UniProtKB/Swiss-Prot annotation:
Record keywords: Lyase, Menaquinone biosynthesis
Organism superkingdom: Bacteria
E.C. number(s) listed in UniProt: 4.2.99.20
NCBIfam families referenced in this protein's UniProt entry, alphabetically: menH_SHCHC, PRK11126.1
Subunit structure: Monomer.
A GO term for molecular function: 2-succinyl-6-hydroxy-2,4-cyclohexadiene-1-carboxylate synthase activity
Function: Catalyzes a proton abstraction reaction that results in 2,5-elimination of pyruvate from 2-succinyl-5-enolpyruvyl-6-hydroxy-3-cyclohexene-1-carboxylate (SEPHCHC) and the formation of 2-succinyl-6-hydroxy-2,4-cyclohexadiene-1-carboxylate (SHCHC).
Organism: Yersinia pseudotuberculosis serotype O:3 (strain YPIII)
GO BP: menaquinone biosynthetic process
Protein name: 2-succinyl-6-hydroxy-2,4-cyclohexadiene-1-carboxylate synthase
InterPro entries: AB_hydrolase_1, AB_hydrolase_fold, SHCHC_synthase_MenH
Catalytic activity of the protein: 5-enolpyruvoyl-6-hydroxy-2-succinyl-cyclohex-3-ene-1-carboxylate = (1R,6R)-6-hydroxy-2-succinyl-cyclohexa-2,4-diene-1-carboxylate + pyruvate
Protein family: Belongs to the AB hydrolase superfamily. MenH family.
Length: 272
């Protein structure tokens, strides 16, 4: 059994859930991040117990690897089992969002109450696009393996999806992410390339649990994606691709509103 490194946060002492085992919030970070990225939001959602997970190749799971989405989904299931988590809401950002969707659609997800995705890509619809993305990600992976990490990160955060960042914010992210291990990042990047990811929209639309899609109002790429595929979209003000970092208070408010609303929905209304 492979279990991922994680941190548990108990509910606030005054929370009605403090003495009772209820659904957990399970948080999956993006590439180059760690479970700690979610700490400000998780603390603001303190009525719920939280599990902050370090994905393979990241944080305290840096020595772990994964052989694609199915393997990571199995590792997630084993981690939940090892921590005694039977009912949970799954939230993921970017790479973590893609893993969360895959797990909800294809993994062993008994006990899953609902899904919250921030800026997660649904995949690529044809083989030509997938092959092109594989080649692109392999080039990035080669750089992560061979070049000084700050140098690669400088270029990484110049990508169009991070266009809302100013120079100071880019510099802060480069410093924050520079403690990663380039080889471990490269392996995870290749294992979870969009070129390997299935097209998730049809399975997502068939989910029998509620789900929502969260996006910064400056994240034009993923706003367009959510609107194009008519996802249940909620936007975060003054935020780009990493909305939970830019505006944790608004993000936590959206999470709590979704949990409250979804807990009151009849089964026939789920994920609609």
């Amino acid at each position: 059994m492979t279990t991922l490194a994680c941190q548990k946060l108990a509910p606030h002492p005054e929370s009605p859930r403090h003495q009772h085992a209820g659904p957990w919030l399970v948080w999956l970070h993006g590439l180059l991040g760690s479970g700690q990225d979610w700490l400000p939001v998780a603390q603001l959602c303190g009525d719920y117990p939280s599990l902050l997970i370090d994905l393979p190749g990241h944080g305290q799971s840096v020595s772990l690897s994964a052989d694609g989405f199915a393997d990571i989904s199995r590792q997630l299931s084993q981690t939940l089992q090892a921590n005694g988590i039977r009912e949970y809401w799954l939230a993921g950002y970017s790479l973590g969002g893609r893993i969360a969707i895959y797990h909800a659609c294809y993994g062993r997800h008994h006990g899953l109450q609902g899904l919250l995705v921030e800026g997660g890509n649904l995949g690529l619809e044809n083989a030509e696009l997938r092959q092109a993305r594989l080649q692109q990600d392999r080039q990035w992976a080669q750089r992560f393996r061979q070049e000084p990490l700050p140098q690669v990160l400088d270029d990484w955060y110049q990508q169009a999806v991070f266009a809302d960042l100013d120079p100071q914010q880019r510099e802060q992210l480069v410093l924050l992410r520079a403690d990663n291990h380039g080889t471990a990042v490269a392996e995870m990047l290749e294992a979870t390339s969009l070129g390997h990811q299935p097209w998730l929209l049809p399975a997502l639309q068939r989910l029998n649990v509620p789900y929502t899609y969260l996006c910064g109002d400056r994240d034009h790429k993923f706003l367009q994606l959510a609107q194009q595929y008519r996802l249940p979209l909620h936007t975060l003000a003054r935020a780009g691709h990493n909305a939970h970092r830019a505006n944790p208070g608004a993000f936590a408010a959206q999470v709590l509103a979704f949990l409250s609303q979804s807990s009151c929905l009849p089964p026939s209304s789920l994920s609609r």
